[in-house]
Amino acid sequence: MKKSVKQEQVTQMHDKLLRAKAVFLADFRGMNVDKATTLRNELRSASVEYKVFKNTLFDIAAKETEAACLAPYLAGPTAVAISYDDPVGAAKVLSKFAKDSKGVFVLKAGVLSGKVIDVNQIQALADLPSREVLIAKMLGSMQAPATNFVGVLAALPGSLVRALDAIRAKKEGN
């Protein structure tokens, strides 16, 4: 491969890493084309870019990005999954695929918000509810006090009416 082509690839990868919210590395040793295609399609549907990239070129491209801390994990055949939107969605797809592939596809590490995350942390990230579910839960918990307050306000006139009715009934009974 010509040096100019390599430089162009490094520049493109560097730009992608700068835009990434999360980057994951995986060992794909022994994975056949059908499985790789399946994984690419699943990742694409989760807005994740999956690429096999030469380790030395990735190391150069990662300099001055949050992914620079992944250098120790660049050994053997390495695939890169770059998430631009939802790191949880990417972690879910990668973790499920790693579990289903039984050792053919193995997660190495990732970087999220500038911090290296290991396989266990990637799995913990995958176990989180989706972004939409978390937002719905947060909105529900924010809305609950207002709903309770409205319920109390609605109950006050009813309580007053019942108290007045009880007083009226008591006076009529005397």
Curated annotation (Swiss-Prot):
Keyword Transcription regulation: no
Keywords: Ribonucleoprotein, Ribosomal protein, RNA-binding, rRNA-binding
Cellular component terms per the entry's GO annotation: large ribosomal subunit
Gene3D superfamilies: 3.30.70.1730, 6.10.250.290
Superkingdom per UniProt: Bacteria
Keyword rRNA-binding carried by entry: yes
One Pfam assignment: Ribosomal_L10
InterPro entries attached to this UniProt entry: Ribosomal_uL10, Ribosomal_uL10-like_sf, Ribosomal_uL10_bac, Ribosomal_uL10_bac_type, Ribosomal_uL10_CS_bac
A molecular function GO annotation: structural constituent of ribosome
GO biological process: translation
PANTHER family in the record: 39S RIBOSOMAL PROTEIN L10, MITOCHONDRIAL
Family per similarity comment: Belongs to the universal ribosomal protein uL10 family.
Assembly information from the UniProt record: Part of the ribosomal stalk of the 50S ribosomal subunit. The N-terminus interacts with L11 and the large rRNA to form the base of the stalk. The C-terminus forms an elongated spine to which L12 dimers bind in a sequential fashion forming a multimeric L10(L12)X complex.
Cited function: Forms part of the ribosomal stalk, playing a central role in the interaction of the ribosome with GTP-bound translation factors.
HAMAP family: Ribosomal_uL10
Name recorded for this polypeptide: Large ribosomal subunit protein uL10
Gene from which this protein is expressed: rplJ
